[in-house]
Amino acid sequence: MPCTCGNWRKWIRPLVVLLYILGLIVGVPICIWKLQKMEVGVHTKAWFIAGIFVLMTIPISLWGILQHLVHYTQPELQKPIIRILWMVPIYSVDSWIALKYPDIAIYVDTCRECYEAYVIYNFMIFLLNYLTNRCPNLALVLEAKDQQRHLPPLCCCPPWAMGDVLLFRCKLGVLQYTVVRPVTTVIALICQLTGVYGEGDFSVKNAWTYLVIINNVSQVFAMYCLVLFYKVLKEELNPIQPVGKFLCVKMVVFVSFWQAVFIAILVKAGVISNTWEWKRVQDVATGLQDFIICVEMFLAAVAHHYSFTYKPYVQEAEEGSCFDSFLAMWDISDIRADISEQVRNVGRTVLGRPRKMFFNDDPEQNEHTSLLSSSTQDPISAASSIPPSPSGHYQGFGQTITPQTTPTAATIPEELYSADSPEADLQVADHSKVSDDSCNHLDS
């Protein structure tokens, strides 16, 4: 039977549950046999206990991902959500493998850390796509707001101009971590092969010390840009309850990083000195970090299940292929296009050329064109854009509405632009009305 059959949403979930049960039937006896065969020590016990948490984590995460695929009604919002949800199983399985095989821990851990940069970027895209749908004139909304000063510790820096400048710099601040992290990962792998990496050892002779500093500065600035972006547009983002989502992303990224640094400090101070079955005390630190992550990912899976729930997107979906839904999850053409666009904008700035305006009079040409254009959309995105109205916009609290008209850039009545009209005086007197009209026209 072809995968495009209309009832695939009915059998895909039981199939996944059945496959997981079969995996347990095969995997658990193997783990028990392995435990009995080997000499049971601290390393083996830690690996077995961590495996129990992995087995509890994966079904929770995969169930949330599967539900989003079944109810894939708003691709521009659900695609980044699915990418974020994949963080938990990737972290969990990666850490479990690294715990079992310490010799390859450096390689699997660096791949895991690269994905965290990808997650931060996709969370930013999720917020931007929601705001773009709800407020097509997002730059106008920002310009109508009071000037936002920088947050500590950058409060002494000149503020970023409200409008497309702030949008560009916040997005670039997040995007730089997506580029810096893979670059430092490649450098770390090269240093490991040449024997100068020294993971977990704070020393001026080891490359690990410098890469940790670079990654930390890049990561902190990316999270700072996210916080600043949220603070400026807090009112507009309230319907999707972003605080819980932000905390889920921030806690996984920050806690995993700082606990690795804290464990390395304990090793350096001599608090952790016993090696047990490991070869070096640094391997003990890496194994402890991987074990803790396996436990933490179970808690993160539960938090992600409720924070990034599929329920607001449950509605009558268009008939589509399960194969297309699956491929849409892996499509990264929007990321490639967005990175290329940001690199070109940075190049224009460095060369002193005028940067391309993101939010101009043409609603088809803006900062998110590369993200939402037909050339980079997945098949499900293209299918959802066939009707004249959008596929629906997340308004929060489990409610999804479908506007009857297509939003355009002309969301403010023309009389507001007339200097002779009384509405124009009202517009000058109260700039906040522009923001309300621009963001609430889809709710009417």
Curated annotation (Swiss-Prot):
Classification via SMART domains: Solute_trans_a (SM01417)
Extent of the signal sequence: none
InterPro entries registered for this protein in UniProt: Ostalpha/TMEM184C
Protein's UniProt keywords contain Transmembrane helix: yes
Keywords of the record: Membrane, Transmembrane, Transmembrane helix
Organism lineage string: Eukaryota, Metazoa, Chordata, Craniata, Vertebrata
Compositionally biased tracts (Low complexity): 399-411
PANTHER family to which the protein is assigned, alphabetical: ORGANIC SOLUTE TRANSPORTER-RELATED
Pfam families assigned to the protein according to its UniProt record, in alphabetical order: Solute_trans_a
Sequence similarity: Belongs to the TMEM184 family.
Entry function: May play a role in cell growth.
Bilayer-spanning residue ranges: 15-35, 46-66, 84-104, 182-202, 210-230, 252-272, 284-304
Subcellular localization, as worded in the UniProt entry: Membrane
GO cellular component: membrane
Composition bias, Polar residues: 368-378
Region listing for Disordered, in residue ranges: 357-411
Membrane topology: Multi-pass membrane protein
Molecular function, one GO term: transmembrane transporter activity
Record protein name field: Transmembrane protein 184C
Organism from which the protein derives: Xenopus laevis (African clawed frog)
